């Protein structure tokens, strides 16, 4: 390895470590991902990333290599293929996010995928990470939809070849090309990634894109998606279409196949280490998720689950009088019994008395899911939080107003009348503590 390569790696590690989290957090995830029984990660790299953000991609992958982790890379090359086809004046079109592939398009696709694959492999090896390109010998396919032309429907995945590359201490770099007998076939890269993950069953499945996540109609990043609660709602949105809609459909199909605890992340290359090695992550985290139930008059069992979640989350004791008037409370709780919200209705405006997620579930998106369901029911709500509460950044990002006091920060949504806001602030300041 050259001196310049060593310096590159040193600078890369320093830059990435400083950008993510604590050493304790990083070591926790490295230990988790280093299990010999399970592959570390399948990372799908969008073609636009290779074209426009190769340096950050290679930096992040070299970092993983340096800490002893070998991801399996599957890349696309959509923008480069479209450009090559336009240069050759070859017509092409899409059906539901998939490229219609004539014989001419297929042949150009093969050349573009080979070039893109080689570009990634050479960039990795230049910086000291061994890599091997796998262009058309991983996916055995059939043609299921004649309207799409030479597009493969994956029937099986050559896991043995992938494992051989990993065991030779190299990073597999896979192109989305398949074969039927001796016939090469084009494959949508997102679909190929889903089938690869099903076959490999890694700890993590990550999609790297230039945008770094899924954004809503106002251009805001969606940090968490709970498919159980939000999938149908999202699929009905006009702003979700074409490639991103297909991607979400494929991710749902993947998570339906995997254990309920599995997740898929969409992020950008520079934030890949943060997504892997911190609880907060970066980009959009998609999980199968859990349903959320309302308990308008919480029974004894619900009260016990609520007490356990809150006391674990707040590291204190719920006051004995909390459920003295259970009819004034509306308890939201996830079906996994790891996140809860209590809304008190004993004031003129609904008051969020408690919002808790157990520490072990931090970073799983449970809080976002239960918050989403609570807001469907309560367009008006206010609450308070200690000034040092780490969730205050989230509260600040979603509230419509905030009053900061020495002991409490008071937040509200959906309240515009000044007198009502003033009354809510007074109520929140003077309300006795419910966890001691």
Describe each PLM feature range.
Residues 395:
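Conserved active-site tyrosine of GNAT-family acetyltransferases
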Residues 398-405:
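Conserved acetyl-CoA-binding loop of GNAT-fold acetyltransferases
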Residues 2-381, 389-390, 400, 410-436:
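C-terminal catalytic "cap/lid" subdomain
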């Amino acid at each position: 390895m050259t001196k310049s390569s060593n310096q590159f790696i040193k600078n890369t590690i320093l830059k990435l470590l400083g950008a993510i989290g604590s050493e304790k957090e990083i070591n926790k995830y490295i230990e988790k991902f280093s299990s010999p029984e399970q592959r570390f990660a399948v990372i799908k790299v969008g073609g636009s990333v290779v074209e426009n953000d190769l340096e950050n991609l290679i930096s992040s992958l070299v970092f993983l290599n340096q800490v002893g982790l070998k991801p399996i890379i599957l890349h696309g090359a959509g923008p480069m293929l479209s450009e090559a086809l336009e240069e050759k004046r070859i017509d092409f079109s899409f059906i539901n996010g998939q490229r219609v592939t004539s014989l001419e398009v297929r042949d150009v696709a093969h050349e573009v995928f080979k070039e893109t694959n080689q570009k990634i492999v050479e960039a990795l090896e230049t910086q000291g990470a061994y890599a091997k390109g796998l262009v058309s010998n991983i996916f055995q396919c059939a043609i299921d939809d004649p309207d799409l032309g030479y597009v493969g429907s994956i029937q099986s995945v050559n896991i043995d070849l992938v494992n051989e590359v990993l065991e030779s201490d190299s990073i597999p770099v896979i192109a989305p090309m398949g074969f039927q007998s001796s016939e090469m076939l084009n494959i949508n890269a997102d679909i190929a990634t889903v089938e690869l993950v099903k076959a490999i069953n890694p700890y993590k499945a990550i999609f790297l894109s230039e945008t770094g996540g899924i954004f809503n109609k106002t251009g805001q990043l969606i940090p968490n998606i709970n498919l159980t609660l939000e999938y149908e709602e999202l699929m009905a949105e006009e702003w979700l279409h074409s490639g991103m809609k297909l991607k979400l459909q494929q991710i749902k199909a993947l998570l339906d196949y995997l254990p309920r605890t599995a997740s898929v992340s969409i992020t950008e290359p520079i934030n890949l280490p943060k997504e892997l090695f911190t609880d907060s992550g970066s980009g959009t985290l998609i999980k199968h998720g859990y349903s959320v139930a309302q308990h308008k008059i919480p029974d004894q069992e619900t009260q016990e689950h609520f007490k356990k979640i809150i006391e674990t989350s707040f590291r204190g004791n719920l006051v004995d009088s909390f459920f003295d008037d259970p009819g004034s409370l509306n308890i939201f709780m996830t079906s996994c019994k790891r996140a809860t919200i209590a809304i008190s209705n004993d004031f003129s405006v609904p008051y969020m008395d408690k919002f808790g997620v157990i520490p072990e579930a931090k970073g799983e998106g449970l809080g976002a899911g239960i918050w989403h369901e609570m807001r469907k029911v309560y367009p008006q709500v206010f609450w308070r939080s200690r000034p040092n509460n780490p969730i205050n950044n989230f509260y600040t990002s979603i509230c419509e107003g905030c009053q900061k006091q020495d002991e409490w920060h008071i937040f509200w949504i959906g309240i515009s009348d000044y007198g009502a806001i003033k009354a809510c602030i007074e109520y929140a300041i003077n309300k006795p503590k419910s966890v001691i």
